[in-house]
Amino acid sequence: MVKILFLTKGIHSSSARYRALFYQDSFIKDKYHTTHYGLSKKISNYLLALINVARFDIVFLQRKLVPIPYFFILRLLAKKIIYDFDDAIFLNSNGDLSKKRYKRFKYICEKSDLVFSGNQYLQSFAKKINSKTFILPTCLNTKAYQVKAKKSKEFIDLVWVGHKSTVKYLLAVIPNLEKANEKIKKLRIINISNVTLSSKKIKIKNVSWNERIQYQYIKSAWLGLAPLDESNWSKGKCAFKLLQYSAAGIPSISSNVGVNSELINHYQNGILIRKNSDWEQSIIKLLTDKRLYQTMKKNSLILAKDYDYKHNYQVMKNLITNEL
């Protein structure tokens, strides 16, 4: 029986959930043995991983840029190491290269047996260091989004799912959403995150993120919002919220950046925004053209099928079997 040790930032990390822990049940069904250690700020967790690592055939290090001395010891003790990442973690949040982060990133990629990147942009960095770098998109359980949810009779809901680290992208386009609301009147933003927002010109419903609750709110919305800025950091994003909206069968309006522009077929399964002023007219167009809306809704569901976790698991398992 092959034993896999997942090392992640912890169960509260979305990357850990969707790129590592999500697949534990599938591995177990295929007769693998899996264990998970969250590498939090406690030194004891790091030591526990080192003490036990020799018992495992594969170490799956997800996203964490551990200190080089720690990884050096991990490499000595581990039989095989897979490094997985889904953000431009070698950059500062402003898009500039971080010397400290890149040094760790380079060392970890170089010494790993396999590297999984979330998109082509990220792969381009890692593959220069390790030729065994493969793209594994962040996927989801599409069935989870096929819940029964009624749309509001009072509001036309625009949903956004995010985090305090990404709320700046939503804040940048709220003035444009407010302008759209001047014409449609009933718009409401459903903000699913850990940040509370408010506006005098458009209604905002703040929803604390919860795995099950998010399915209901996404499904009940009319449109999904995915704003980004034009930065290298944004290019490292893997467009997961677009997949969430698509799985729920709602069209998306997104910035024409990075993976967003790869997933969205303009005016087929969503609308790509090139400048902030386009948000207003795109929302109005999509909500007033019923035929266009229904076409995009149908095509959104088709897109989501290609990113179901079951397909991704088979790709991951084949890479582990054939490349390690």
Please name every model-derived segment.
Residues S165-K168, R212-Y217, W222-A247, S254-E262:
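Nucleotide-sugar-dependent
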Residues L47-R55, P69-L77, L97-V115, K128:
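Membrane-proximal helix-turn-helix segments that form the acceptor-binding/catalytic region
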Residues Y121, C139:
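Carbohydrate-associated surface elements
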Residues Y309-L324:
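C-terminal alpha-helical cap of glycosyltransferases
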Residues L292-D306, N318:
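A short, well-ordered alpha-helix in the C-terminal region of glycosyltransferases
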Residues H266-S277, K285-R291:
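Conserved acidic donor-binding segment of nucleotide-sugar-dependent glycosyltransferases
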Residues I82-L97, K111-L114:
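A short, histidine- and acid-enriched strand-loop-helix "catalytic/donor-clamping" loop
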Residues I11-S26, N141-A144, K153-K219:
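Conserved catalytic-core segment of nucleotide-activated headgroup transferases in glycan assembly
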